[in-house]
């Protein structure tokens, strides 16, 4: 039995290539729409917050700013999860990379979702990126901006490639 299994594995092989993360155009479009909806939802949340957050509904024991950041993180995490689900559904269960992830051989479905779908919001100690320049994370963005991209949301995937600002946010 062992010899037969080794023989099958040797003849068939079990490798993954860059084309295993290929998505059809409709999947890429759907992921792009999900990321855009997430960014729009963050903008709407920032609009609700206003300039000082005095009328913003807070959670018990949290300041308005802490509540805002938690809400934004939930929105962006949901967008990442949705785009990952789209990528997973289009990759299919017969894909070698998916088989490796689901069998536990190497990687995970989260890794595949980041390679094919969307990377999402990088976090430092459970929070969005905060440090960098004075009142902003990168000099590319206006001061005191709290939008999705301004605080590090990465809508691209590793396969599609990253913008320079996205690359810096992940480093």
Mark where each language-model region is.
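Append "with occasional cross-activation on large, charged helical scaffolds in nucleic-acid assemblies
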Residues: 2-171
């Amino acid at each position: 039995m062992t010899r037969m299994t080794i023989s099958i594995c040797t003849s068939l092989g079990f490798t993954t290539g860059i084309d295993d993360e290929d998505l059809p155009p409709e999947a890429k479009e759907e992921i792009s729409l999900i990321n855009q909806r997430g960014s729009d939802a963050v903008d709407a949340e920032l609009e609700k917050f206003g300039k000082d957050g005095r009328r913003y509904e807070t959670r018990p024991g949290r300041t308005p700013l802490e509540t805002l950041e938690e809400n934004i993180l939930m929105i962006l995490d949901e967008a990442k999860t949705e785009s990952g689900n789209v990528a997973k559904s289009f990759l299919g269960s017969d894909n070698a990379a998916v088989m490796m992830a689901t069998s536990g051989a190497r990687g995970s479905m989260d890794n595949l979702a980041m390679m094919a779908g969307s990377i999402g919001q990088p976090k430092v100690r459970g929070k969005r990126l905060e440090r960098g320049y004075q009142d902003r994370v990168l000099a590319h963005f206006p001061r005191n901006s709290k939008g999705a991209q301004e605080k590090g949301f990465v809508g691209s995937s590793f396969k599609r490639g990253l913008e320079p600002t996205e690359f810096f946010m992940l480093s």
